[in-house]
Amino acid sequence: MSSLRRPEHVVRSIPDALSGARPAISFEFFPPKDDAGEALLWETIRRLEKTQPTFVSVTYGAGGTSRDRTIRVTDRIARETTMTPMAHLTCVGHSVTELRNIIGHYANGAVRNILALRGDPQGGLDQPWVSHPEGLDHAEQLVSLVRQLGPFTVGVAAFPDRHPESPSLDADAEVLVRKADAGAAFAITQFFFTTDAYLRLRDRVVARGRELPIIPGLMPVTNVRQLARMTELSGQPVPKDVSDRLEAVDGDPAAVREVGVQIATELAQSLLAEGAPGIHFITMNRSPATLQVWDNLGLEAAQWGAAAAVPDPVRS
Protein backbone atom coordinates (compact mmCIF):
# COMPACT_ATOMS: atom_id res chain seq x y z
CA MET A 1 0.00 0.00 0.00
CA SER A 2 1.33 3.42 -0.91
CA SER A 3 2.62 5.49 2.01
CA LEU A 4 2.39 8.83 0.17
CA ARG A 5 0.47 11.55 1.99
CA ARG A 6 -2.89 12.03 0.33
CA PRO A 7 -4.77 15.31 -0.14
CA GLU A 8 -7.20 16.33 2.60
CA HIS A 9 -10.26 15.97 0.37
CA VAL A 10 -9.39 12.33 -0.36
CA VAL A 11 -9.11 11.24 3.28
CA ARG A 12 -11.94 13.41 4.62
CA SER A 13 -14.26 11.44 6.92
CA ILE A 14 -17.80 11.09 5.58
CA PRO A 15 -19.19 9.92 8.98
CA ASP A 16 -17.67 12.98 10.69
CA ALA A 17 -19.34 15.26 8.15
CA LEU A 18 -22.68 13.51 8.71
CA SER A 19 -22.54 14.43 12.40
CA GLY A 20 -21.81 18.10 11.75
CA ALA A 21 -24.16 21.07 11.96
CA ARG A 22 -24.25 21.60 8.18
CA PRO A 23 -26.40 19.17 6.17
CA ALA A 24 -24.20 16.78 4.21
CA ILE A 25 -24.86 17.31 0.51
CA SER A 26 -23.61 14.72 -1.96
CA PHE A 27 -24.01 13.91 -5.64
CA GLU A 28 -24.23 10.65 -7.57
CA PHE A 29 -22.86 10.23 -11.09
CA PHE A 30 -22.75 7.31 -13.49
CA PRO A 31 -19.80 6.44 -15.74
CA PRO A 32 -20.39 7.63 -19.32
CA LYS A 33 -20.48 5.27 -22.29
CA ASP A 34 -18.99 7.56 -24.94
CA ASP A 35 -17.07 10.80 -25.50
CA ALA A 36 -20.21 12.95 -25.56
CA GLY A 37 -21.31 11.47 -22.25
CA GLU A 38 -17.83 12.06 -20.84
CA ALA A 39 -17.96 15.73 -21.79
CA LEU A 40 -21.42 16.15 -20.23
CA LEU A 41 -20.32 14.39 -17.04
CA TRP A 42 -17.29 16.61 -16.55
CA GLU A 43 -19.25 19.77 -17.28
CA THR A 44 -21.69 18.65 -14.56
CA ILE A 45 -18.89 17.74 -12.15
CA ARG A 46 -17.25 21.16 -12.54
CA ARG A 47 -20.53 22.99 -11.96
CA LEU A 48 -21.48 20.94 -8.92
CA GLU A 49 -17.95 21.07 -7.48
CA LYS A 50 -18.54 24.74 -6.74
CA THR A 51 -21.08 23.80 -4.04
CA GLN A 52 -18.30 21.93 -2.19
CA PRO A 53 -20.31 18.75 -1.51
CA THR A 54 -19.48 16.43 1.37
CA PHE A 55 -18.73 13.67 -1.15
CA VAL A 56 -19.66 12.40 -4.60
CA SER A 57 -20.25 8.83 -5.74
CA VAL A 58 -19.84 6.96 -9.02
CA THR A 59 -22.20 4.08 -9.78
CA TYR A 60 -21.37 0.58 -10.97
CA GLY A 61 -23.15 -0.82 -14.03
CA ALA A 62 -25.42 -3.87 -13.87
CA GLY A 63 -23.37 -7.03 -13.67
CA GLY A 64 -20.18 -5.04 -13.26
CA THR A 65 -20.41 -3.89 -16.88
CA SER A 66 -18.97 -0.46 -16.10
CA ARG A 67 -16.19 -1.63 -13.78
CA ASP A 68 -13.27 -0.05 -15.63
CA ARG A 69 -15.19 3.17 -16.32
CA THR A 70 -16.27 3.46 -12.68
CA ILE A 71 -12.66 3.06 -11.54
CA ARG A 72 -11.40 5.57 -14.11
CA VAL A 73 -13.97 8.27 -13.25
CA THR A 74 -13.56 7.79 -9.49
CA ASP A 75 -9.77 7.98 -9.75
CA ARG A 76 -9.97 11.12 -11.89
CA ILE A 77 -12.32 12.85 -9.43
CA ALA A 78 -9.80 12.11 -6.66
CA ARG A 79 -6.89 13.48 -8.74
CA GLU A 80 -8.42 16.46 -10.51
CA THR A 81 -11.10 17.90 -8.22
CA THR A 82 -11.50 19.08 -4.63
CA MET A 83 -14.31 16.58 -4.01
CA THR A 84 -14.22 13.43 -1.87
CA PRO A 85 -14.98 10.45 -4.15
CA MET A 86 -16.84 7.27 -3.23
CA ALA A 87 -16.83 4.29 -5.58
CA HIS A 88 -19.83 1.98 -5.85
CA LEU A 89 -18.92 -1.72 -5.87
CA THR A 90 -21.26 -4.70 -6.35
CA CYS A 91 -21.04 -8.42 -5.70
CA VAL A 92 -22.84 -9.35 -8.91
CA GLY A 93 -20.73 -10.99 -11.61
CA HIS A 94 -17.51 -10.99 -9.59
CA SER A 95 -15.47 -13.66 -7.86
CA VAL A 96 -13.92 -12.82 -4.50
CA THR A 97 -10.55 -12.65 -6.25
CA GLU A 98 -11.85 -10.04 -8.69
CA LEU A 99 -13.37 -8.04 -5.85
CA ARG A 100 -10.08 -8.17 -3.95
CA ASN A 101 -8.26 -6.82 -7.01
CA ILE A 102 -10.67 -3.90 -7.39
CA ILE A 103 -10.53 -3.05 -3.69
CA GLY A 104 -6.74 -3.37 -3.80
CA HIS A 105 -6.59 -0.86 -6.64
CA TYR A 106 -8.47 1.67 -4.52
CA ALA A 107 -6.37 0.87 -1.43
CA ASN A 108 -3.20 1.66 -3.39
CA GLY A 109 -4.69 4.79 -4.91
CA ALA A 110 -6.58 7.84 -3.74
CA VAL A 111 -10.05 6.45 -2.96
CA ARG A 112 -10.97 5.81 0.66
CA ASN A 113 -14.76 5.45 0.47
CA ILE A 114 -16.72 2.55 -1.05
CA LEU A 115 -20.47 1.97 -1.30
CA ALA A 116 -20.80 -1.81 -0.93
CA LEU A 117 -23.82 -3.25 -2.75
CA ARG A 118 -25.08 -6.67 -3.65
CA GLY A 119 -26.22 -5.33 -7.02
CA ASP A 120 -29.19 -6.08 -9.25
CA PRO A 121 -29.61 -9.54 -10.83
CA GLN A 122 -27.85 -10.05 -14.12
CA GLY A 123 -30.35 -9.92 -16.96
CA GLY A 124 -32.67 -7.43 -15.29
CA LEU A 125 -34.68 -6.73 -12.18
CA ASP A 126 -37.25 -9.40 -13.08
CA GLN A 127 -34.61 -12.13 -13.00
CA PRO A 128 -33.68 -14.18 -9.91
CA TRP A 129 -30.51 -13.34 -8.04
CA VAL A 130 -27.69 -15.78 -8.81
CA SER A 131 -24.33 -15.21 -7.16
CA HIS A 132 -21.01 -15.80 -8.88
CA PRO A 133 -19.89 -19.39 -8.10
CA GLU A 134 -16.76 -17.98 -6.45
CA GLY A 135 -18.34 -14.77 -5.24
CA LEU A 136 -20.47 -13.31 -2.47
CA ASP A 137 -24.21 -13.52 -1.83
CA HIS A 138 -24.89 -10.50 0.35
CA ALA A 139 -23.80 -6.88 0.74
CA GLU A 140 -22.74 -7.42 4.35
CA GLN A 141 -20.15 -9.93 3.12
CA LEU A 142 -18.76 -7.28 0.78
CA VAL A 143 -18.69 -4.75 3.62
CA SER A 144 -16.55 -7.16 5.66
CA LEU A 145 -14.23 -7.81 2.72
CA VAL A 146 -13.69 -4.11 2.02
CA ARG A 147 -12.97 -3.41 5.68
CA GLN A 148 -10.40 -6.23 5.74
CA LEU A 149 -8.45 -4.94 2.75
CA GLY A 150 -7.78 -1.29 3.47
CA PRO A 151 -8.48 1.85 5.51
CA PHE A 152 -11.89 2.37 3.94
CA THR A 153 -15.09 4.00 5.09
CA VAL A 154 -17.93 1.82 3.82
CA GLY A 155 -21.47 2.89 3.00
CA VAL A 156 -24.41 0.68 2.05
CA ALA A 157 -27.85 0.94 0.45
CA ALA A 158 -31.16 1.31 2.30
CA PHE A 159 -34.74 0.98 1.06
CA PRO A 160 -37.47 3.15 2.63
CA ASP A 161 -40.18 1.71 0.37
CA ARG A 162 -39.06 -1.93 0.71
CA HIS A 163 -36.51 -3.75 -1.42
CA PRO A 164 -38.23 -5.51 -4.37
CA GLU A 165 -37.13 -8.91 -3.02
CA SER A 166 -37.90 -8.20 0.63
CA PRO A 167 -40.94 -9.70 2.39
CA SER A 168 -41.42 -6.68 4.68
CA LEU A 169 -40.12 -3.35 5.92
CA ASP A 170 -39.01 -5.08 9.11
CA ALA A 171 -36.88 -7.47 7.05
CA ASP A 172 -35.30 -4.48 5.27
CA ALA A 173 -34.39 -2.92 8.61
CA GLU A 174 -32.87 -6.19 9.82
CA VAL A 175 -30.72 -6.44 6.68
CA LEU A 176 -29.54 -2.86 7.18
CA VAL A 177 -28.58 -3.61 10.79
CA ARG A 178 -26.56 -6.63 9.62
CA LYS A 179 -24.68 -4.38 7.21
CA ALA A 180 -23.93 -2.00 10.07
CA ASP A 181 -22.78 -4.91 12.23
CA ALA A 182 -20.40 -5.90 9.41
CA GLY A 183 -18.80 -2.45 9.52
CA ALA A 184 -20.91 -0.06 7.44
CA ALA A 185 -20.58 3.51 8.70
CA PHE A 186 -23.62 5.00 6.95
CA ALA A 187 -26.35 4.21 4.44
CA ILE A 188 -27.78 5.95 1.37
CA THR A 189 -31.37 5.23 0.43
CA GLN A 190 -32.98 4.35 -2.85
CA PHE A 191 -34.98 7.35 -4.10
CA PHE A 192 -38.45 7.75 -2.57
CA PHE A 193 -41.16 10.40 -2.38
CA THR A 194 -42.54 10.62 1.18
CA THR A 195 -40.94 11.68 4.43
CA ASP A 196 -42.94 9.03 6.28
CA ALA A 197 -41.18 6.26 4.33
CA TYR A 198 -37.80 7.56 5.48
CA LEU A 199 -38.90 7.97 9.09
CA ARG A 200 -40.34 4.44 9.20
CA LEU A 201 -37.00 3.01 8.13
CA ARG A 202 -34.98 5.17 10.51
CA ASP A 203 -37.25 4.30 13.44
CA ARG A 204 -37.03 0.58 12.70
CA VAL A 205 -33.24 0.72 12.67
CA VAL A 206 -33.12 2.69 15.94
CA ALA A 207 -35.54 0.21 17.52
CA ARG A 208 -32.98 -2.50 16.76
CA GLY A 209 -30.30 -0.67 18.71
CA ARG A 210 -28.50 1.05 15.84
CA GLU A 211 -27.87 4.78 15.31
CA LEU A 212 -26.70 4.36 11.71
CA PRO A 213 -26.71 7.64 9.74
CA ILE A 214 -29.13 7.21 6.82
CA ILE A 215 -28.78 9.73 3.98
CA PRO A 216 -31.93 10.15 1.87
CA GLY A 217 -31.43 9.61 -1.86
CA LEU A 218 -33.33 12.17 -3.92
CA MET A 219 -33.80 12.38 -7.69
CA PRO A 220 -35.54 15.47 -9.09
CA VAL A 221 -37.98 14.38 -11.81
CA THR A 222 -37.41 16.39 -14.98
CA ASN A 223 -39.72 14.56 -17.40
CA VAL A 224 -42.88 12.49 -17.01
CA ARG A 225 -41.31 9.46 -18.72
CA GLN A 226 -39.07 9.05 -15.68
CA LEU A 227 -42.03 8.01 -13.54
CA ALA A 228 -42.44 4.59 -15.16
CA ARG A 229 -38.71 3.91 -14.92
CA MET A 230 -38.66 4.96 -11.27
CA THR A 231 -41.49 2.54 -10.52
CA GLU A 232 -39.57 -0.24 -12.27
CA LEU A 233 -36.35 0.46 -10.38
CA SER A 234 -37.90 0.83 -6.93
CA GLY A 235 -40.59 -1.81 -7.23
CA GLN A 236 -43.06 0.71 -5.79
CA PRO A 237 -45.56 3.00 -7.57
CA VAL A 238 -44.89 6.72 -7.56
CA PRO A 239 -47.40 8.34 -5.14
CA LYS A 240 -50.51 9.58 -6.93
CA ASP A 241 -50.17 13.14 -5.70
CA VAL A 242 -46.67 13.28 -7.21
CA SER A 243 -47.67 11.78 -10.56
CA ASP A 244 -50.79 13.99 -10.71
CA ARG A 245 -48.75 17.17 -10.23
CA LEU A 246 -46.32 16.20 -12.97
CA GLU A 247 -48.89 14.85 -15.42
CA ALA A 248 -50.93 18.05 -15.06
CA VAL A 249 -48.17 19.92 -16.91
CA ASP A 250 -47.12 17.11 -19.27
CA GLY A 251 -46.40 18.58 -22.69
CA ASP A 252 -44.65 21.63 -21.25
CA PRO A 253 -41.06 20.50 -20.55
CA ALA A 254 -40.12 23.65 -18.65
CA ALA A 255 -43.19 23.36 -16.42
CA VAL A 256 -42.53 19.66 -15.76
CA ARG A 257 -38.98 20.45 -14.73
CA GLU A 258 -40.14 23.27 -12.47
CA VAL A 259 -42.74 21.06 -10.78
CA GLY A 260 -40.18 18.27 -10.39
CA VAL A 261 -37.74 20.66 -8.75
CA GLN A 262 -40.45 21.93 -6.42
CA ILE A 263 -41.45 18.39 -5.39
CA ALA A 264 -37.80 17.55 -4.69
CA THR A 265 -37.31 20.79 -2.74
CA GLU A 266 -40.38 20.15 -0.58
CA LEU A 267 -39.23 16.62 0.21
CA ALA A 268 -35.66 17.71 1.00
CA GLN A 269 -36.89 20.49 3.29
CA SER A 270 -39.15 18.07 5.15
CA LEU A 271 -36.41 15.46 5.53
CA LEU A 272 -33.86 17.94 6.84
CA ALA A 273 -36.44 19.31 9.28
CA GLU A 274 -36.92 15.76 10.58
CA GLY A 275 -33.21 15.39 11.27
CA ALA A 276 -31.92 13.67 8.14
CA PRO A 277 -28.12 14.13 8.08
CA GLY A 278 -28.14 15.40 4.51
CA ILE A 279 -29.36 14.77 0.97
CA HIS A 280 -27.77 12.56 -1.70
CA PHE A 281 -28.75 13.88 -5.14
CA ILE A 282 -29.05 11.35 -7.96
CA THR A 283 -28.01 13.73 -10.73
CA MET A 284 -28.26 11.56 -13.87
CA ASN A 285 -25.06 13.42 -14.84
CA ARG A 286 -26.91 16.73 -15.20
CA SER A 287 -26.59 19.76 -12.96
CA PRO A 288 -29.42 22.29 -13.51
CA ALA A 289 -32.25 20.64 -11.53
CA THR A 290 -29.89 19.59 -8.74
CA LEU A 291 -28.42 23.08 -8.46
CA GLN A 292 -31.89 24.61 -8.40
CA VAL A 293 -32.96 22.38 -5.49
CA TRP A 294 -29.68 23.16 -3.71
CA ASP A 295 -30.35 26.87 -4.21
CA ASN A 296 -33.97 26.53 -3.04
CA LEU A 297 -32.74 24.93 0.18
CA GLY A 298 -30.66 28.03 0.92
CA LEU A 299 -27.49 26.04 1.46
CA GLU A 300 -24.03 27.54 1.41
CA ALA A 301 -20.94 25.91 -0.03
CA ALA A 302 -18.85 24.17 2.62
CA GLN A 303 -15.41 25.48 3.45
CA TRP A 304 -13.10 22.44 3.25
CA GLY A 305 -9.58 23.76 3.74
CA ALA A 306 -7.94 24.32 0.35
CA ALA A 307 -11.26 23.73 -1.35
CA ALA A 308 -12.52 27.04 0.03
CA ALA A 309 -10.85 28.78 -2.91
CA VAL A 310 -13.41 27.33 -5.34
CA PRO A 311 -15.68 30.15 -6.62
CA ASP A 312 -19.35 30.48 -5.70
CA PRO A 313 -21.64 28.06 -7.52
CA VAL A 314 -23.25 28.96 -10.81
CA ARG A 315 -26.98 28.92 -10.16
CA SER A 316 -29.31 27.47 -12.78
Where are these regions (language model features)?
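Conserved N-terminal beta1-alpha1 strand-loop-helix module at the mouth
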Residues: 2-58
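Active-site pocket-lining/capping segments in soluble small-molecule metabolic enzymes
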Residues: 6-11, 133-159, 208-266, 297-316
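Active-site-adjacent beta->alpha loops and helix N-cap segments on the catalytic face
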Residues: 7-8, 14-15, 36-39, 64-76, ...
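Short, well-ordered coil/turn segments that N-cap beta-strands
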Residues: 20-24, 52-55, 81-85, 110-112, ...
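Active-site mouth loops of central-metabolism enzymes
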Residues: 24-42, 85-97, 153-171, 247-262
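Conserved, mostly hydrophobic/aromatic
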Residues: 28, 56, 106, 179, ...
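Active-site beta-loop-alpha junctions enriched in small/polar residues
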Residues: 29-32, 59-63, 88-94, 117-120, ...
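Active-site/ligand-binding-proximal alpha/beta "capping" segment
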Residues: 144-188, 262-277
